[in-house]
């Protein structure tokens, strides 16, 4: 998962009994005018995901990244920004929501440093691309602000070596078409691999994490590099990251964290391994078994029902897509 698992678990435990049902009662965040042009795969899961982040709570949910990611995952079902509700579209098209005002920072801005949050900014660029959002001016503004943070060697100052953030910067820049900057940031990402082959939030750690390693693999695989030497180095790093994931798997079909099963990490690992050309059928079978009657994917802290935080990261791997293939339009 993207946020600290312990913190998310506490939040999720609090909201499970009221938050999910409230989101369903308050109304779906996707506009009613959505055209049924082609039936998506796993329609019940798509329906669950559409209602997971409602108009009523969307403004308070954008800062974590999960709402943005749920919209990214819906792009895999053919949803575009034009099919989102006005309240959700505003999160992509209103300056006061994106960057903020003199009274309140936007969701892409750190309230303490007043600078752009690099990982969330990358996710915004990626989401804007795959959702076909009509917000090119704001995308350009985000890229300009990100460029200031990117050093000559590709390091992203505000990320403080957080491989998750840097991976999303790569994906966002690549989505926006800034391939030269994306390649530079790839160089910095390669240097963040731990000795065990994994990547993590903190460069001072000695071990990798499942989800961060998986998003790093996808970021690295999303960018065509300019020469054979760079490509060889990237491929070597990816191979070590793949070996890390395979070694961390439990029972050859899922991952665990904090003493329990980790469906988010498993979902991410599926996408990372698939992006690297690995067979993920056993992992997909395990994740598919956690899909509940409401279409959502079950979380260990809320058994018997779908969880919006898990489903926000789990739909694409269930239908055989990754953040690399989605960006390529596949």
Q: Which residues make up each language-model segment?
A:
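Short helix/strand-capping connector loops at secondary-structure junctions
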Residues: 1, 292-300
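Bacterial Sec-dependent N-terminal signal peptides
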Residues: 1-15
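C-terminal segment of classical bacterial N-terminal signal peptides
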Residues: 16-34
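Structural signature of transmembrane alpha-helix termini at the membrane-water interface
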Residues: 28-32, 150-157
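Extended, well-ordered alpha-helical scaffold segments
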Residues: 36-54, 80-108, 134-153, 178-192, ...
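An alpha-helical repeat/solenoid feature that recognizes helix-turn-helix modules
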Residues: 55-82, 105-136, 156-184, 195-237, ...
């Amino acid at each position: 998962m993207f946020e600290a698992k312990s913190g998310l678990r506490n939040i999720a435990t609090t909201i499970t009994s009221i938050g999910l049902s409230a989101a369903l009662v308050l109304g779906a965040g996707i506009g009613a005018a959505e055209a049924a042009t082609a039936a998506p795969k796993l329609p019940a899961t798509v329906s669950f995901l559409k209602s997971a982040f409602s108009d009523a709570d969307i403004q308070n949910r954008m800062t974590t990244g999960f709402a943005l990611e749920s919209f990214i995952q819906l792009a895999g079902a053919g949803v575009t920004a034009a099919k989102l509700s006005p309240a959700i579209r505003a999160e992509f098209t209103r300056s006061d929501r994106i960057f903020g005002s003199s009274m309140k920072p936007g969701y892409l801005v750190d309230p303490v440093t007043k600078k752009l949050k690099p990982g969330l900014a990358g996710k915004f660029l990626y989401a804007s691309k795959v959702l076909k959002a009509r917000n090119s001016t704001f995308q350009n503004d985000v890229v300009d602000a990100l460029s200031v943070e990117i050093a000559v060697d590709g390091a992203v100052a505000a990320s403080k070596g957080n491989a998750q953030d840097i991976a999303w910067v790569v994906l966002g820049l690549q989505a926006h078409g800034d391939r030269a900057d994306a390649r530079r940031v790839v160089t910095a990402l390669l240097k963040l691999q731990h000795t065990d082959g994994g990547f993590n939030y903190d460069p001072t750690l000695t071990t990798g994490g499942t989800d961060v390693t998986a998003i790093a693999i996808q970021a690295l695989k999303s960018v065509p590099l300019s020469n054979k030497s760079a490509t060889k180095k990237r491929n070597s790093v990816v191979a070590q990251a793949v070996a890390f994931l395979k070694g961390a798997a439990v029972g050859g079909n899922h991952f665990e964290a904090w003493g329990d099963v980790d469906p988010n990490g498993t979902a991410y690992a599926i996408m990372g391994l698939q992006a690297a050309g690995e067979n993920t059928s056993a992992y997909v079978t395990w994740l598919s078994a956690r899909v509940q009657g409401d279409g959502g994917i079950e979380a260990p802290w809320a058994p018997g029902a779908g969880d919006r935080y898990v489903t926000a990261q789990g739909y694409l791997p269930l239908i055989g897509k990754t953040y690399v293939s989605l960006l390529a339009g596949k």
